Design a protein with these regions (language model features):
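Juxtamembrane intracellular "pre-TM" segments in multi-pass secondary transporters
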Residues: 1-2, 182-213
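Short amphipathic helix-loop junctions that connect adjacent transmembrane helices
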Residues: 25-37, 227-243, 247
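Intracellular juxtamembrane helix-capping segments at the cytosolic ends
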Residues: 26, 108-122, 311-324
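Helix-to-loop junctions at the C-terminal end of transmembrane segments
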Residues: 54-67, 257-271, 355
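C-terminal ends and interior cores of transmembrane alpha-helices
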Residues: 76-91, 281-293
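Helix-loop-helix hairpin linking two adjacent transmembrane segments in secondary transporters
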Residues: 94-96, 133-180
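Cytoplasmic helix-loop-helix junction between adjacent transmembrane helices
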Residues: 98-136
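C-terminal membrane-cytosol helix-exit motif in multi-pass small-molecule transporters
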Residues: 169-189, 377-382
Length: 389
C-alpha cells in the first residue's frame, strides 16, 4: 500500500467517528433536550441533511484548494462542530445541539471525499481494492467512536454526554496531524480549454446513471430502515437498550467488514453482478422483517441490510470513478454526492414519521419499488453495453 493510501485510510478512521457517535447518542440526547417528543430524532437527521446540503460545496472547495487543504480544513471544522455540540449539551440547548449536528454533517461531507482520494492514489486496476480498504477502515471508526464516547460520557460531573463530544473533538483533530504527511498528486498545470460534459450529458451515460441510482437508493433504503430500527425495537416493542444496541452494532459491522472481500469480488465478477448480489440481501432483509420481529431476526435482517449496502455502495462508487474523465471528476463527484445524500436525508427524515403513521412491516414494503428501480437501471446499463459490444 502506498503512503498516501495509508494516510487516507488512517484519516478516514478518525474523520468518520462523528457518524457512529451521532447515530449512537444524538437521538438519546435529543429525547432529553427536545421540548417536543416528535423532534427527538431531528438531530440525527440534521447530520444527514448537513452532509447532503454541503456535498456539492465540499467537492467544489476541493477542486479549488486541493484534497490536502480540503481535508485539513474539514478536520478543524469538525473539531469546532463537536465542541459546539458539547457546549449545547452543557447549556441544555436543544436548538444549538441541532445546529451543531447539522455542522457535523457539513464536515462529514468532506469525509465522504476520502473514497475518491483513495481511488485517485492508485492505478485504475487497483481502484476496487483501494475503495475496499478505505471502506473497511470505517469499521474501526464504528467501533472506536461509540466506545470512546461511552467511556467519556461522565467526564464532566452533572453534564452527561458533554465528555462524549469533547472526546469526539479530539478524534476529529487527529487527521489534521496525519494529513500533514499526505503528498497530493502533482498534476501538470495546463490551460483549461475543455471542462468536460455537462450534468445532463453525464446522467445520460448508462453506467453513470447506474452508479448514482445504485449508491443513492442503497443509502436511502439502509437509512430508512436503520433510523426506524431503534425506535421500533426499544420504544414500540420494548426491547432493552442493550439489545437494541447489539443489533445496531451488528448492522454497522456488516456494513464495513465485507470490504475485506468486496474489492476482490468486484475485480472477479464485475460491478453489476455485485449490485445484483446486494439487491438479493436487501430482499432478504424485507422478507425477514415482514414475517418476524424476534431479537435474532432483527440481527439477521440488519446484518443483511448492512451487507447489501456494502455491495451496492462500493459497486456504485467503483462504477462512478470509471464513468468520468479527469477534468470532470469534481463535477461528477459533487453531483453524485449531493443526490446520494439528499435522497438519504429524505429517507432518514421520513423514517420516524412513516413508522408512526404506518407500521414496521409497511415500511419494509415501501422499500420494494426502490429495490426494483436499482435492478431496472442496472439491467438497462448491461443491455446497452452488450449492444455496443
Amino acid at each position: 500500500m502506498n503512503r498516501n493510501l495509508w494516510i487516507i485510510t488512517l484519516s478516514q478512521i478518525f474523520s468518520f467517528t462523528p457518524a457512529p457517535i451521532n447515530v449512537f447518542l444524538s437521538g438519546i440526547i435529543g429525547s432529553t433536550l427536545s421540548p417536543v417528543k416528535a423532534l427527538q430524532t431531528v438531530p440525527t437527521s440534521l447530520m444527514i441533511v448537513g452532509i447532503a446540503v454541503f456535498s456539492f460545496f465540499a467537492a467544489k472547495i476541493m477542486s479549488i484548494i486541493g484534497r490536502k487543504a480540503g481535508f485539513l480544513l474539514a478536520s478543524l471544522f469538525s473539531t469546532f462542530s463537536a465542541l459546539l455540540a458539547a457546549y449545547a449539551i452543557w447549556d441544555k440547548n436543544f436548538y444549538l445541539f441541532c445546529l451543531s449536528c447539522f455542522l457535523i454533517g457539513n464536515g462529514m461531507s468532506f469525509t465522504h471525499q476520502y473514497r475518491f482520494a483513495a481511488a485517485e492514489s492508485v492505478e485504475k486496476e487497483f481502484i476496487p481494492k483501494a475503495l475496499s480498504i478505505v471502506m473497511l477502515a470505517t469499521i474501526f471508526a464504528a467501533l472506536l467512536g461509540p466506545n470512546i464516547a461511552n467511556f467519556n460520557k461522565d467526564l464532566f460531573d452533572d453534564h452527561l454526554y458533554v465528555g462524549s463530544y469533547v472526546s469526539l473533538a479530539v478524534l476529529t483533530f487527529v487527521p489534521f496531524i496525519l494529513l500533514n504527511f499526505y503528498e497530493p498528486q502533482s498534476v501538470p498545470r495546463v490551460k483549461k480549454t475543455y471542462e468536460g460534459r455537462n450534468y445532463l450529458q453525464l446522467i445520460s451515460q448508462p453506467r453513470f446513471l447506474q452508479a448514482v441510482v445504485t449508491s443513492a437508493f442503497a443509502y436511502a433504503i439502509m437509512s430508512f430502515l436503520m433510523t426506524a430500527t431503534p425506535i421500533n425495537m426499544h420504544v414500540l416493542e420494548h426491547y432493552s437498550l442493550s439489545k437494541t444496541g447489539v443489533v445496531i452494532q451488528f448492522h454497522i459491522i456488516s456494513m464495513f467488514l465485507p470490504s475485506l472481500i468486496t474489492g476482490r469480488l468486484l475485480t472477479k465478477f464485475g460491478h453489476s453482478k455485485i449490485i445484483y448480489a446486494g439487491v438479493f440481501f436487501y430482499v432478504l432483509t424485507v422478507i425477514i422483517c415482514f414475517f418476524d420481529t424476534s431479537f435474532i431476526n432483527y440481527i439477521f435482517a440488519l446484518v443483511f441490510l448492512g451487507l447489501g449496502w456494502n455491495f451496492l455502495y462500493i459497486s456504485g462508487t467503483g462504477l462512478l470513478v470509471l464513468s468520468y474523465n479527469e477534468e470532470e471528476k469534481f463535477k461528477a463527484q459533487g453531483f453524485n454526492d449531493i443526490l446520494v445524500f439528499s435522497i438519504q436525508a429524505l429517507a432518514s427524515l421520513s423514517a420516524g414519521y412513516m413508522l408512526s403513521m404506518t407500521s414496521w412491516k409497511t415500511m419494509n414494503l415501501i422499500t420494494i419499488p426502490f429495490i426494483i428501480l436499482i435492478i431496472l437501471v442496472s439491467l438497462r446499463a448491461d443491455l446497452l453495453e452488450k449492444k455496443l459490444n
